Amino acid sequence: MSEEVVQDAPLENNELNAEIDLQKTIQEEYKLWKQNVPFLYDLVITHALEWPSLTIQWLPDKKTIPGTDYSIQRLILGTHTSGNDQNYLQIASVQLPNFDEDTTEFTPSTIRRAQATGSYTIEISQKIPHDGDVNRARYMPQKPEIIATMGEGGNAYIFDTTCHDALTTGEALPQAVLKGHTAEGFGLCWNPNLPGNLATGAEDQVICLWDVQTQSFTSSETKVISPIAKYHRHTDIVNDVQFHPQHEALLASVSDDCTLQIHDTRLNPEEEAPKVIQAHSKAINAVAINPFNDYLLATASADKTVALWDLRNPYQRLHTLEGHEDEVYGLEWSPHDEPILASSSTDRRVCIWDLEKIGEEQTPEDAEDGSPELLFMHGGHTNRISEFSWCPNERWVVGSLADDNILQIWSPSRVIWGRDHVQVSPRDLE
């Protein structure tokens, strides 16, 4: 027994020293990042949350405040207390500085104020009790007051925020409980073309399809809803699902089984998916379909890459985006510019890619900084990034969360992205 302890001690010391070295490197990188913020960003707002949040999404509304230099915009957040406290679905109100409408950028005075004083506030404006950690939360596009969540116990929940007070206490009382999964999950997506149509994916390897449009919700009753269809097509954890932005019957899913699958919800769910693509050599964590281009799709993987695909011929990869140093978990196209894609990783970075730059010639010096399509790398977090979200109302504004409770709202400098973007064809990526 004593020999085993002696043998294990050097290994433990090595791991401890490696962790100390890593934390030292992270702090040095953060210090360097902070020094360069005035040159790299038009806006940075940092806010410490009470508890970590695994999920973030901007709501679509924007409230202009007369006589001020800012607007009020809102974020959906959750809590991740790991059983140490009551969990909540949260709405945060964010003061965002006004853009100069003529140049679609922040005015210089507001940039300096935001960077120097942190004068724009972030406040939790609504807290709704939630059963367990909030793994994912998304609003219904047709009715933003309706929010779906994925919980840690396998159930999904529907909340009507108008049925809850600003700071609700007590037990969780969702408007509906969606029972269909036997394990927790993170896959959650509303159908943008079919109100009330919702897809979920979980660790039980199942995709569930739900219809909540026919339900009428009240503040006093929690309804139990069963799925209208279940897909047992993956052979491992389903990590993400996304409906096609233009076609209501098309649903994409990705899994630890390394496949990208395209489903047609009009077909028999007992049959094999119409398209099954072995997209990566390791687990696929996220999928995103371009909102402007019907055929352009991206996947993010544990192999540290993002892959681009053409839905007309998805069995041949268009291009690989390389720049992350660890597993890629987050993926979202810009809602404003067709060729702009962002990704996040356990390497504590959010990368912004410009597909128009694929194939551009580089000097050896530029090549050392990454591929030509790597437009920007946000390095403001010192812990693993949970999720990020593009702001729908302000071009080039992103909100991102890290496991250390830090929420950041940021916008790269116009010097970096300042040019008009044109449409990109999948043929140009080949």
UniProtKB/Swiss-Prot annotation:
Location relative to the cell: Cytoplasm; Nucleus; Chromosome, Centromere; Chromosome, Centromere, Kinetochore
Role: Regulatory subunit of the histone acetylase B (HAT-B) complex. The complex acetylates 'Lys-12' of histone H4 which is required for telomeric silencing. Component of the CENP-A recruiting complex that ensures the integrity of mitotic spindles through maintenance of kinetochore factors mis6/CENP-I and cnp1/CENP-A. Maintains the deacetylated state of histones specifically in the central core of the centromeres.
Family annotation (PROSITE patterns): WD_REPEATS_1 (PS00678), WD_REPEATS_2 (PS50082), WD_REPEATS_REGION (PS50294)
Domain of life (superkingdom): Eukaryota
Site entry: Important for interaction with HAT1: 296
Protein name (database record): Histone acetyltransferase type B subunit 2
Family: Belongs to the WD repeat RBAP46/RBAP48/MSI1 family.
Subunit architecture: Component of the HAT-B complex composed of at least hat1 and hat2. The HAT-B complex binds to histone H4 tail. Component of the CENP-A recruiting complex composed of at least mis16, mis19, mis19 and mis20.
Main location: cytoplasm
PANTHER family membership: WD40 REPEAT FAMILY
Annotated region (Interaction with the histone H4 N-terminus), positions in chain: 365-369
Biological process, per Gene Ontology: CENP-A containing chromatin assembly; chromatin remodeling
Residues found modified as Phosphoserine: 425
WD repeats: 129-169, 180-220, 233-273, 279-319, 323-363, 380-420
A single MF term (Gene Ontology): H3-H4 histone complex chaperone activity
GO CC entries: CENP-A recruiting complex; chromosome, centromeric region; cytoplasm; kinetochore; nucleus
Alphabetical UniProt keywords: Centromere, Chromatin regulator, Chromosome, Cytoplasm, Kinetochore, Nucleus, Phosphoprotein, Repeat, WD repeat
